A protein has these predicted regions:
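Amphipathic alpha-helical interface elements
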Residues: 1-169
Length: 169
C-alpha cells in the first residue's frame, strides 16, 4: 500500500512540474521587465547591488538582542550567482544572473521591506488583481506555490494524508 501511495504521489508531482516551471519563469520574467522599466536599466540586477539592495532601511535593531541586523538576502543571492557564473568561465550578464535565481529570490520582492523600497512595482505585474488583493495576498500565494514546489522536489507527500488522497494542501 505504501509503495502504491508513493508512486501515485510521484505521478501527481510529475503532472505539476510543467505548471510550476512555467509559473516560475513567467514570474521571473515579468518581475525583470517591471524592474528594468522602473530603474530604466536592463542590467538592474547587477547595478542595484549598490542601490536598493543595500538601502539603509534594510538594517534594523533586533528587539531581543539589541544587535543591528541587515537583510542582504537579494545582494547575497546576486553575488552567489555571479560567482557561480564566473566559476564556469562565463561572462557575467544580467540574463545569466537572473536565470540563476531561485523562486525564493523572486518571492522576496513581495516581502514588506523590499516591496516598499521598490515603490510597489512587484504587484504591477498582476494587471487584474481582485479587489482587496495586494502585496500580502500575492506574497502568500507565491509562498504557497514555492512550498508546494519544494515538497514536490524533495519527494514529500503532496496529497496523501492518513492514506487518503487530500488536495487541501
Amino acid at each position: 500500500k505504501a509503495v502504491m501511495l508513493y508512486f501515485a504521489n510521484m505521478k501527481i508531482a510529475q503532472a505539476f512540474h510543467p505548471l510550476l516551471s512555467s509559473f516560475e519563469v513567467i514570474l521571473r520574467n515579468q518581475l525583470h521587465y517591471a524592474l528594468a522599466h522602473h530603474f530604466s536599466d536592463g542590467n538592474w540586477i547587477i547595478n542595484q547591488k549598490n542601490g536598493f539592495m543595500v538601502a539603509s532601511s534594510l538594517t534594523h535593531t533586533n528587539k531581543r538582542t539589541k544587535k543591528q541586523v541587515t537583510n542582504r538576502y537579494l545582494l547575497t543571492e546576486v553575488q552567489k550567482a555571479e560567482k557561480k557564473i564566473s566559476d564556469r568561465g562565463a561572462r557575467i550578464t544580467a540574463g545569466r544572473v537572473i536565470a540563476e535565481q531561485t523562486l525564493g529570490f523572486w518571492n522576496s520582492f513581495y516581502e514588506v521591506h523590499h516591496y516598499i523600497l521598490l515603490s510597489g512595482v512587484p504587484c504591477t505585474i498582476f494587471k487584474k488583481l481582485p479587489s482587496g488583493y495586494g502585496r500580502k495576498q500575492v506574497n502568500d500565494v507565491i509562498t504557497q506555490v514555492r512550498e508546494l514546489r519544494n515538497r514536490i522536489n524533495h519527494n514529500e507527500p503532496i496529497c496523501f494524508v492518513n492514506k487518503k488522497c487530500d488536495f487541501s494542501y
